[in-house]
């Protein structure tokens, strides 16, 4: 074969390879465009479904408690029981339906106590605050006013879950006469946030899924919640509805942004002198030192604690045990 013939063969092979590459690139481009189109249509369908269902669900599942005016917005306060001691339940960060989330526990206590759940702005049936600061002092004043407007009066036994442990400790420091005791349901203490920055990526992802209705495509998130096992079918539907449309609201995100600052303020106030009992989870899914921090705090407070072999939502996973212990603890206080 001459040099010229060899060059022609090479050019032919190159043209052939180039043609195959262009065809591959074209096919890939159309596949990607098709995928983008499918995702766009799917997202649009999810949004439309969400927009249609949301007002229907708001009408179908009205608030079971009182709506009271606080600081330019309305807050939902649910209460039952007529006992002399008032137990006030405070929800952890992102709990979408506190009035239903705590039901497994307060239904086991409301025969003997006044049980009250305050839903902070942006939670459950409460309105969004409209941009009002979520610093711990503002949140506490709103909680106190909501209780007063709902006809409740201190002193209160506070039962905070998770992040609201900070609010309970701040409350006891600022207004000791209003807090008879703190019974923490795997409550957070300031040290839990010293080296725990906000999970911004997770917050952004969950916010996107909530706003676009994509959470509705994952019903296991609701059905698998330990709280649902304590609810009727209708209340379970209301719980799921609130989860789909009230997860990661603007107020919840604002709370997360100021959590570390709130923790620093509470830490500076020291350990309040108030009867203290902490029910502590197995720590799964939390920071590695969660249990150690809580045990240390309970001991520093001169209080009691019990480590349970259950997840973070201790009040839903071990309500019988906790109700029994709450009664025994409160009976000791009045002797």
Where are the predicted features?
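A catalytic-pocket lid/entrance helix-loop region that shapes and gates access to the active site
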Residues: 185-219
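Conserved serine/cysteine hydrolase catalytic core
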Residues: 231-300, 309
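Active-site loop/oxyanion-hole signature of alpha/beta-hydrolase fold enzymes
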Residues: 117-159
């Amino acid at each position: 074969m001459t040099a010229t013939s060899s060059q022609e063969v090479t050019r032919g092979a190159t043209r052939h390879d180039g043609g195959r590459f262009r065809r591959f690139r074209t096919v890939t481009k159309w596949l990607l465009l098709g995928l983008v189109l499918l995702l766009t249509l799917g997202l649009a369908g999810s949004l439309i479904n969400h927009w249609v269902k949301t007002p229907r669900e708001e009408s179908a599942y009205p608030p079971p408690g009182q709506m009271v005016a606080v600081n330019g917005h309305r807050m939902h306060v649910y209460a039952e029981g007529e006992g002399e001691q008032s137990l006030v339940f405070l929800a952890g960060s992102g709990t979408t339906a506190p009035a239903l989330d705590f039901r497994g526990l307060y239904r086991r206590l409301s025969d003997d106590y006044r049980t009250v759940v305050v839903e902070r702005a942006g939670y459950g049936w409460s309105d969004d605050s409209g941009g009002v600061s979520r610093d711990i002092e503002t949140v506490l004043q709103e909680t106190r006013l909501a209780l007063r407007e709902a006809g409740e009066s201190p002193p209160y036994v506070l039962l905070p879950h998770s992040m609201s442990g900070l609010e309970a400790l701040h409350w006891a420091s600022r207004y000791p006469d209003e807090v008879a005791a703190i019974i923490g349901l795997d409550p957070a203490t300031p040290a839990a946030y010293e080296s725990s920055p906000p999970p911004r990526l997770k917050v952004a992802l969950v916010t996107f899924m909530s706003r676009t209705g994509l959470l509705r495509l994952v019903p296991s998130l609701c059905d698998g919640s330990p709280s649902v096992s304590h609810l009727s079918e209708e209340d379970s539907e209301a719980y799921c509805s609130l989860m789909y449309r009230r997860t990661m609201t603007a107020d919840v995100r604002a709370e997360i942004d100021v959590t570390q600052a709130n923790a620093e303020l509470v830490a500076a106030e020291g350990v309040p002198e108030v009867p203290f009992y902490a029910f502590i989870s197995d720590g799964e899914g939390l920071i590695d030192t969660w249990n150690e921090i809580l045990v240390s705090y309970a001991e520093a407070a001169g209080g009691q604690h019990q480590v349970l072999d259950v997840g973070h939502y201790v009040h839903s996973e071990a309500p019988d045990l906790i109700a029994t212990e709450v009664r025994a603890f409160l009976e000791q206080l009045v002797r």
